[in-house]
Amino acid sequence: MYNPPLFREDRPEILHAILREARLAILVSAGTDGVPEATHVPLQLAADEGKHGTLYGHLARANTHWRGLAAAGRARAIFMGPEAYVSPSFYASKREHGKVVPTWNYVAVHAIGAIEVFEDAARLHALVERLTNHHEAPRAKPWAVDDAPEAFIASQLKGIVGLRLEIETLIGKRKLSQNRPEQDQHGVIEGLGSSEDARDRDVAALMQRGS
C-alpha cells in the first residue's frame, strides 16, 4: 500500500481499534495462475496472541480460496475504516487561488502474516462459538451455538474451514487532509460534518479529534 509518512499510522492501539471496528476484511493471497485471490470475510482479532495479534475466521469449504491460502502459507487482510469524498469547494484555498482538486479521505489497515487453514472439528466448534458469542453480545437476547441441535451444528461445521492469521506486519494509513493547510482542514471538517451521509460525518469526527 502506498503510504506517505504524513499519513502513516503506527500506534498498535489505533491499528487494533480499526481492525475491531471494520470487522469485515478482504483476505488476499497469491493465486496459482499469477492472479491474486481475494475473499470478503469477517475476521476477529485476538490482540494478545503474537507480537501484533492474531486474526481468526472461517471460509466455506466450497470456496476454493482456502486451498490457495493453504498452499501460499501467507496472506494479507485489508480492513477499511471511514472514508469520504472531499470536494475542492470545502477548501479555503479555492477562494484564494482556485488551484485545488478533489481527493478522498480514508482509513485503512493491512495485516500481513502466516496463515493456517484448519479442519479439526473441535477447533472449528470453539472458533464458531467464540465468533458467535462476540457478535451476539450486544443483543438483548443473544443466540448461542448450543441453541441449535448438536447434530445440525456438526453437519454445518463440515461445510467450513478455519483460518488463523498470525500478524507479522501491520500497515496503517489515515489519510485525513494532513497535507492541506489548517484552514482547508477546517473547511473539510465543516463540509463533511454537515453532510447527510453518515460516512462523511464519521470522517469529519475523526478529523475533529485529530488523533
Indicate where each model-derived feature is located:
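Binding-site signature for planar aromatic cofactors or substrates
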Residues: 1-211
